[in-house]
């Protein structure tokens, strides 16, 4: 198994490198559109397969995880998760602002070299984006939320005739009306909220909902087994995606030279956040080596770079955290889907740098209040950027908020293919460190819950064993030995653990064996508690 993991890691990293090399080798030959389509076709099919798995993966993982924790533990995990994500997103934005203000990559002379931008302004505001996220948290139709989400749009209405007081001429004024529309994107945030509530209620119901809990546990195991097989397709898909993106870029050399300092600024900011800020935060909380943690995440980071999608990387991130780093699956299955939806550290940093860079291009001096506004709006806007490959729409909102021209943002599209992949890797790393920190902070309460559950199950077993008319254990119960064994398995391999995965029938031990098993279980509980 270890050799297979290492081989898959090597193949994933090699696919990224080979995709870049092939892209630059093929570019000078100016391949036709049909050739480019054929090169990118495996990557296109790969992304469709991965996106097909996102919906069942999120629903089964969130519900099965929260159904196996106490309500108060779920509440604590949720609160700590939100606090962590808000802190890291703000730190990323702050890093970007400090760096771009210090390096000052935006030279007004570049406007003559790059030409005028073509992107249109948007009437959307930061408030619109924030309210859209609140609306999407509570979808009116859960089925519709699987393929659509709400988005505010401003539609032009019939122009009104306005009299000009100075010239007395009639002029036309274009007005816009705010409307709510639906875009064809999965409402991941709404699904997570629904599944979280569903899972918590299942946990409260306990044995009354055991059949439903078992269903989602098994469904989660099926999806992960399926994805484990599909992971061998990741290297081919990543190679195809990276190669096609490099071939598709127009005027790569000229624009890259003009925007070199901008690219360096963004990459430096992302490196500082991922190699200094996040590891330091992880070390301060857990007192463990962050670099050993990052080593276990190499395949997930390479996949994030290749796909430029936090959502597509989600299965690999689950596997890396649960199997390589032994993070409790009840933490990963809630923290990671939420992080892939609302937490975009790399995107927030990138947006802050891009906005101030455009201001520098136009030689616009930003006040302290402008910088504060940028930090707040980029934090809020990055939350709405979703788990799919990021676009530049959210930056337009930030530019409009501080009164900067949004049209010049199109000049950055040429280098966005590279920066998008790097910032996606940073997003995934931030989510992963968050899972590690939250696992550390909640481990004692989760172990306490496991101990209470184990004691309750043992008492039920003893009551059944004391029944003289019972020859074998019924399907709904299990032996003390199987309880102990499953608890030990849970500590060693939380990824494959299921509290319901017990033997259907087990022989009844005699009185001495029963007492010995009970003592063993109590000793196990004490040792597990002392681990914390």
UniProtKB/Swiss-Prot annotation:
Pfam families linked: SDF
Ranges facing Cytoplasmic side: 1-5
Localization (cell): Membrane
Name the record gives this protein: Putative sodium-dependent excitatory amino acid transporter glt-3
Gene that encodes it: glt-3
Keyword Glycoprotein: yes
Species this protein is from: Caenorhabditis elegans
Keyword terms: Glycoprotein, Membrane, Symport, Transmembrane, Transmembrane helix, Transport
Protein's UniProt keywords contain Ion transport: no
Taxonomic path: Eukaryota, Metazoa, Ecdysozoa, Nematoda, Chromadorea
């Amino acid at each position: 198994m270890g050799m297979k993991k290492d081989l898959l890691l090597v193949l994933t990293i090699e696919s990224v490198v080979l995709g870049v090399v092939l892209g630059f080798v093929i570019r000078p030959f100016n391949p036709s559109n049909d050739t480019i389509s054929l090169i990118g076709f495996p990557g296109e099919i790969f992304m469709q397969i991965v996106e097909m798995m996102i919906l069942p993966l999120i629903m089964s993982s969130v519900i099965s995880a929260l159904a196996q924790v106490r309500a108060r533990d779920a509440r604590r995990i949720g609160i700590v998760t939100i606090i962590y994500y808000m802190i890291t997103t703000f730190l990323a934005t702050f890093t970007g602002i400090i760096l771009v203000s210090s390096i000052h990559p935006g030279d007004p002379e570049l406007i003559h070299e790059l030409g005028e931008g073509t992107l249109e302004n948007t009437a959307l505001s930061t408030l619109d984006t924030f309210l859209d996220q609140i609306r999407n948290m509570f979808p009116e139709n859960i089925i519709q939320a699987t393929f659509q989400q709400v988005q505010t749009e401003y539609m032009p209405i019939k122009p009104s005739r306005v009299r000009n007081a100075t010239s007395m001429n009639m002029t036309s004024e274009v007005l816009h009306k705010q409307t709510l529309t639906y875009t064809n994107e999965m409402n991941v945030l709404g699904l997570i909220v629904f599944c979280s509530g569903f899972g918590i209620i299942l946990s409260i119901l306990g044995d009354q909902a055991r059949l439903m809990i078992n269903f989602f546990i098994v469904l989660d195991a099926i999806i992960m087994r399926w994805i484990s097989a599909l992971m061998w397709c990741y290297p081919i898909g990543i190679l195809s995606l990276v190669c096609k993106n490099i071939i598709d870029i127009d005027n790569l050399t000229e624009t890259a030279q003009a925007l070199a300092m901008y690219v360096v600024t963004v990459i430096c900011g992302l490196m500082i956040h991922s190699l200094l800020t996040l590891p330091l935060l992880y070390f301060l909380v857990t007192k463990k080596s962050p670099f050993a943690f990052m080593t276990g995440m190499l395949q997930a980071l390479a996949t994030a770079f290749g796909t430029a999608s936090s959502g597509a990387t989600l299965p690999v991130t689950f596997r890396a955290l649960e199997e390589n780093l032994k993070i409790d699956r009840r933490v990963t299955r809630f923290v990671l889907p939420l992080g892939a939806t609302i937490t975009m550290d790399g995107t927030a940093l990138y947006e802050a740098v891009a906005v101030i860079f455009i201001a520098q291009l136009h030689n616009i001096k930003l006040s302290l209040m402008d910088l504060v506004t940028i930090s707040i709006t980029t934090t809020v806007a990055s939350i709405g950027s979703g788990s799919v490959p990021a676009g530049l729409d959210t930056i337009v909102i930030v530019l409009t908020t501080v009164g900067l021209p949004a049209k010049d943002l199109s000049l950055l599209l040429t280098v966005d293919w590279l920066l998008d992949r790097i910032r996606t890797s940073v997003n995934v790393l931030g989510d992963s460190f968050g899972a590690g920190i939250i696992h550390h902070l909640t481990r004692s309460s989760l172990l306490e819950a496991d101990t209470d559950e184990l004691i309750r199950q043992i008492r039920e077993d003893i009551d059944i064993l004391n029944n003289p008319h019972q020859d074998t254990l019924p399907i709904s119960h299990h032996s003390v030995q199987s309880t102990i064994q499953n608890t030990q398995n849970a500590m060693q391999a939380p990824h494959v653990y299921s509290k319901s995965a017990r033997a259907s029938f087990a022989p009844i031990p005699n009185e001495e064996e029963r007492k010995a098993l009970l003592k063993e279980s109590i000793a196990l509980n004490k040792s597990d508690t002392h681990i914390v």
